[in-house]
Amino acid sequence: MFEAILSPFRWLMSWLLGAFHSILEFAGLPADSGWTWALSILLLVVLIRTLLIPLFVKQIKAQRAMQAIQPELQKLQAKYKGKKDQLSRQAMAMEQQALMKEHKANPFAACLPLLIQMPFFFALYQVLIGARGAAERGEAMDALSADQIRSFEGSTIFGARMSDTFMNSLGAPGSGPVIVTAIVLILLMSGSMFFMQKMLMTKNMTQQALSGPMMQTQQIMLYAMPLIFGIGGINLSLIHI
């Protein structure tokens, strides 16, 4: 089921990746360079993010609407403070929903861009992680030809193969470039993930709104996601980072 859903996304991601690589090759970049493949992936990610800008705008508007009704939500919480019976809890929930509907505030709108991105990036990850097996078999994969797969799998950055991982390189002879490159990439990606989300939160939310329960949960995720990515990154190949 999951594979059937991702299959068209994977084909699209592989086609776009190959198209960007061909464009960069036509522009004069070496076809087998790791930098050419890395730039192709970067352009693909930028394209997806650009297409999702309207959703990010909707997310910001939803956050501002939630910010605007925080005083009213706090009044409702004070009104029903200490009331634990089911009728009171239902009444509070209904009043909160009515307030959000009136002001067109949706606490779940912030999740929409993430949910839309997930199939695209899961598909891209499958393309990248499946390249090694396809290269070993000498096969094409989705929209990428066998030659493109071979070029992708054999490409290097700073002498480190794109398919190498931090953990698999520990203690191996000549693994210095892989380890250094992996650490730098993990720090850069974790840091950029943190600062981009932090900037989005502080720009669009007041301190009062940031102290609310929902925003406190988002702040936990703000620190947790880069940490999870950093820990998981040591097991990913360089191109997956």
Which residues does each PLM region occupy?
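Interfacial loop/helix-cap signal at membrane boundaries in integral membrane proteins
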Residues: 1-40, 144-178
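Conserved small/polar residues in nucleotide/adenosyl-binding loops
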Residues: 240-241
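Membrane-interface amphipathic helices and adjacent TM-edge segments
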Residues: 50-121, 194-228
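Membrane-interface starts of transmembrane alpha-helices
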Residues: 32-44, 181, 214-218
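Non-cytosolic segments of integral membrane proteins
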Residues: 86-98, 102-110, 114-186
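Lipid-exposed faces of alpha-helical membrane segments in multi-pass integral membrane proteins
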Residues: 39-51, 184-195, 224-231
